[in-house]
């Protein structure tokens, strides 16, 4: 895909899996792991600059990533204090690893392997329609998000106490929504979530 757009993805994978009780991102999923499945779908879409932010269970998740054929395309960043920081802090850490050539950056959840490769493809196709592309289901925002490089400065400047969703609300006029299925709202928090979705 030499003519593919230059896009990075920051995969947020620093959570502590408290409700799962184990390293959920390294659990089996399809022919790989939960985190592996997430990364595979971006790689299959030509996203070659993949930044994964680790935190809780960092070694287990890193080992799962090492088993991917395209591991050389993955940059590891670590949130050293996942207990006392928020998702937006992990995002900032991840953005330090994006390629200088990238025109857009996906912000993705490491525990959302349900999202299809096709949703990501459609988001990439829409990238020129607005600075922010968000998949939605029944009027609810989902993940991943696709953000133009031009907005990364304001995203990095979100003040303490504010969230990534606060930032989206402030930039509502710059969002194009992609209608998708409910998978864009899903994640894996409990053993019940994992068993239901992995066997579906």
How does the language model describe each region?
Residues 2-5, 159-200:
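Conserved alpha/beta core of the MobA/IspD/sugar-nucleotide pyrophosphorylase nucleotidyltransferase superfamily
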Residues 3-57:
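N-terminal glycine-rich phosphate-binding loop and ensuing alpha1 helix
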Residues 20, 61-65, 123, 155, ...:
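Hydrophobic packing residues within well-ordered alpha-helices of enzyme cores
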Residues 83-149, 153-156:
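Conserved beta-loop-beta/alpha segment of the NTase-like Rossmann-fold superfamily
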């Amino acid at each position: 895909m030499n003519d593919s757009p230059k896009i990075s993805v920051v995969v947020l994978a620093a959570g502590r899996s408290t409700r799962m009780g184990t390293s959920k991102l390294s659990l089996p999923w399809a022919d790989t792991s939960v985190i592996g499945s997430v990364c595979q779908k971006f790689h299959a879409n030509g996203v070659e600059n993949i930044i994964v932010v680790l935190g809780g269970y960092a070694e287990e998740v890193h080992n799962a990533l090492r088993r991917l054929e395209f591991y050389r395309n993955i940059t590891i960043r670590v949130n050293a204090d996942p207990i006392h920081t928020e998702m937006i802090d992990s995002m900032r850490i991840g953005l330090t690893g994006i390629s200088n050539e990238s025109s857009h950056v996906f912000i993705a959840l490491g525990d959302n392997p349900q999202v299809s490769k096709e949703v990501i493809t459609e988001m990439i196709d829409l990238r020129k329609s607005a600075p922010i592309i968000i998949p939605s289901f029944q009027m609810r925002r989902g993940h991943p998000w696709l953000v133009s490089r031009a907005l990364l400065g304001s995203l990095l400047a979100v003040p303490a106490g504010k969230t990534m969703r606060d930032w989206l609300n402030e930039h509502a006029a710059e969002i194009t929504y992609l209608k998708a299925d409910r998978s864009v709202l899903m994640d894996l928090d409990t053993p019940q979530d994992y068993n239901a979705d992995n066997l579906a």
